[in-house]
């Protein structure tokens, strides 16, 4: 693995839509946010079309697919409705995630090993439509091996436990799990992405895992944008990723 390979930043713009949906106004524009993120160096745009439509709406996905210049990564649950939407809109990539209506945000990885047939069938349907499929999973070898059996070419490692670690010892343990998981995935021929809970303060160590190709980050960027502006917030994260990988 070439440690000099740059990391692609996928900017998750869900929380731009969260602000809009709080008042059900036409602003702020998700599409405008995506344009600004691209201008600042984002390598892709990520959006989660949840079953309850709490933030991103169907029309947002359609507009993003029609107009952005980079990659659209659609996060979605493993349901027939979402597969049909993905096959109609045809994003560059789909990341399959677990989903519960009562959760504030995605709380854990997919149980691929426990639902191998259903997830495998979804991977086949999306793959047959020419859509790259990734599976959002915890950094557990059994889940990574199941992802390979399901036919997904990409995994996204759930970094939430690392991000939520209460002290340096816990953080070190979770970081080692991520490093080992990335090595297991590489040995199985899988592309490794990662995300969830990553911030400007904790992303550096993740960048130094050489197998990681893409990081999807949203909340921290949108939060910083309140004070510095979205373009600067994205540019700061792009610079941080490159410095951590190459420095």
Swiss-Prot record:
The reaction(s) this protein catalyses: 3-amino-2-oxopropyl phosphate + 1-deoxy-D-xylulose 5-phosphate = pyridoxine 5'-phosphate + phosphate + 2 H2O + H(+)
Active site residues of this protein: 48, 75, 196
Pathway terms, separated by semicolons: Cofactor biosynthesis; pyridoxine 5'-phosphate biosynthesis; pyridoxine 5'-phosphate from D-erythrose 4-phosphate: step 5/5
Entry's Gene Ontology BP terms: pyridoxine biosynthetic process
Function statement: Catalyzes the complicated ring closure reaction between the two acyclic compounds 1-deoxy-D-xylulose-5-phosphate (DXP) and 3-amino-2-oxopropyl phosphate (1-amino-acetone-3-phosphate or AAP) to form pyridoxine 5'-phosphate (PNP) and inorganic phosphate.
NCBIfam families according to UniProt: pdxJ, PRK05265.1-1, PRK05265.1-2, PRK05265.1-3, PRK05265.1-5
Stated name of the protein: Pyridoxine 5'-phosphate synthase
Originating organism: Methylococcus capsulatus (strain ATCC 33009 / NCIMB 11132 / Bath)
Gene from which this protein is expressed: pdxJ
């Amino acid at each position: 693995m070439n440690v000099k390979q740059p990391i692609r930043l996928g900017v998750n713009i869900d929380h731009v839509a969260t602000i809009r949906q709080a008042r059900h106004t036409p602003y702020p524009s998700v599409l405008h946010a995506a344009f600004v993120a691209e201008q600042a160096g984002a390598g892709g745009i990520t959006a989660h079309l949840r079953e309850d439509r709490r933030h991103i709406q169907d029309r947002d996905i359609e507009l993003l697919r029609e107009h952005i210049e980079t990659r659209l990564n659609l996060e979605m649950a493993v349901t027939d409705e979402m597969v049909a939407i993905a096959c109609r809109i045809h994003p560059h990539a789909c990341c399959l995630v677990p989903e519960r209506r009562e959760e504030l945000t995605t709380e854990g990885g997919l149980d691929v090993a426990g639902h191998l047939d259903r997830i495998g069938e979804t991977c086949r349907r999306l793959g047959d439509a020419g859509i790259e499929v990734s599976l959002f999973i915890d950094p557990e070898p059994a889940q990574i091996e199941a992802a390979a059996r399901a036919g997904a070419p990409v995994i996204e490692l759930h970094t939430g436990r690392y991000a939520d670690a209460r002290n340096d010892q816990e953080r070190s343990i979770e970081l080692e799990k991520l490093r080992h998981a990335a090595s297991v995935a590489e040995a199985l021929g899988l592309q490794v992405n990662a995300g969830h809970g990553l911030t400007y303060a904790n992303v550096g160590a993740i960048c130094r895992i050489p197998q990681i190709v893409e990081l999807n980050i949203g909340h921290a960027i949108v939060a910083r944008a309140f004070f510095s502006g979205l373009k600067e917030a994205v540019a700061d994260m792009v610079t941080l990723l490159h410095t951590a990988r190459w420095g």
